[in-house]
């Protein structure tokens, strides 16, 4: 069973039909209280993952919590999307092929996280 949850969301007004969205997440993530679990963080746009490239990060859990063991992550990529208001979302789910831990895995994305969204033309990339 995959558990999917929305971690962060922001609205962006994309003006040009031919441009792409450049998205960056910078922050600390952790999966804990398990040694077989794995979590996948990914960007979605209006509830759908980017069709031309996945923008994702995967972290495996550690068996025990031993203090502030967060990993700094920079998750970055580009996605083509139609013009208009876009909901840019950071989601987290179980990795495919990994069973859930008997205890609830600890996932944290609130240690000074930052999402940056900018509209770019193909020539700017």
Locations of the language-model features?
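Extracellular jelly-roll beta-sandwich "head" domains, especially the C-terminal globular C1q domain
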Residues: 1-125
């Amino acid at each position: 069973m995959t558990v999917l949850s929305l971690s962060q969301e922001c609205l962006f007004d994309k003006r040009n039909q031919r441009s792409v969205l450049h998205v960056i997440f910078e922050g600390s993530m952790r999966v804990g209280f398990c040694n077989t679990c794995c979590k996948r963080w990914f960007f979605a746009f209006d509830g759908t993952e980017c069709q031309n490239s996945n923008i994702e990060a995967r972290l495996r859990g550690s068996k025990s919590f031993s203090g502030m063991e967060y990993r700094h992550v920079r998750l970055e990529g580009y996605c083509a999307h139609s013009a208009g208001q876009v909901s840019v979302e950071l989601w987290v789910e179980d990795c495919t092929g990994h069973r859930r831990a008997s205890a609830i895995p600890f996932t944290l994305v609130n240690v000074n996280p930052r999402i940056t969204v900018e509209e770019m033309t193909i020539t700017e990339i």
